[in-house]
Amino acid sequence: MRVMVLSRGTPSPEAPLRGIFEYDQAVALRQQAHEVVLAVLDARSARHWRKFGTRVEHAVERDDGITVVRLDVPVGAVSARTDHRVHAWAARRLHRTVTSEWGTPDVIHAHFARFAAAATRAEFPEPLVWTEHDSHLANPDRRLTEDISVAGDRADAVVSVSQGLSSRLAGHGITSTVIPNIVDVDLFDRPARRHEGTVVVSVATLNPGKGMVELAHAVEQVPGVQLRIIGDGPQRGSLETIAANNPNIVLLGTQPRERIAEELAGADAFALASHAETFGVVCAEALASGLPVLTTACGGPQEFIDDSNGMVVPVGDVDALADGLQQVLGRPWDRAAIAWQARSRFAAGPVVDQLETVYRQAISSHVTTG
């Protein structure tokens, strides 16, 4: 099957997690013998320096062999109307390049409402599948509300990455199939590294919604535990202040997934104190490493974290986080069983099987207009 994946970006050394969900799916589809072109529409403002215009790349740094067609347009903060028009124009230009160079896709797979709506406004004639990941659906602004409506009216199939997100889409009158994000389980399947003391790893953007300051305060209540934090963001200064008085709080900054996998292999547990998550891929990656996970009841993670692989505590409760850490760290875990469970749920094979079913349904139900 020939698939055009419409994405917001691709991972890079400067932004290793940008577009990572879309990229992982594209790689997995190609590995299952599908023809895949990743059409990237990067509409970030000009302060994110990059070459503007359309260009073709072949992603070979990991031998993935994915063809990437990029269109970089510095849009930034503009009115909803202008945003819609620019994205539709850019999507149309990407589509024209893809079809002229590689032929007509069997299906368009757009990630996020913004890009599914752009495909709709650009009047793509092919079947359209829309996957939603965005936590902002809980409180959408005007632009997102309009994009949801436009994409929902046009998409031949809609996918959500969690049941909670599916319920939010249902509130907009949109029915969706729940398919989780893909985890590179082979990358995270590493032998546990021996280390001194007790180590907990957490990975998140350092903003208030991720609860990292709360987690750091919780660790202060659990003697002998080192918290290794991967990520960066506006709360780094607050965390540096905490770390200055507690050598067991270690800030590692933003790291590529290979380094994250190394850190998880040397840990005893993973913790996420987020206030809201649509899926929580970092929790799934930790499970793939065989780690038990302590998470808050923030949405997506609580759909796959239970007594067999971790613990769920209330959001924003430092004492509950501290107690949860003590319980998770004080219990023996079968790391091999945790990793196997993650592989059976989040590995590329099972997820691609579900995507192929959705693609066939979209193609079958699609009615060409115009």
Feature-to-residue mapping (PLM):
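Carbohydrate-associated surface elements
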Residues: 164, 182
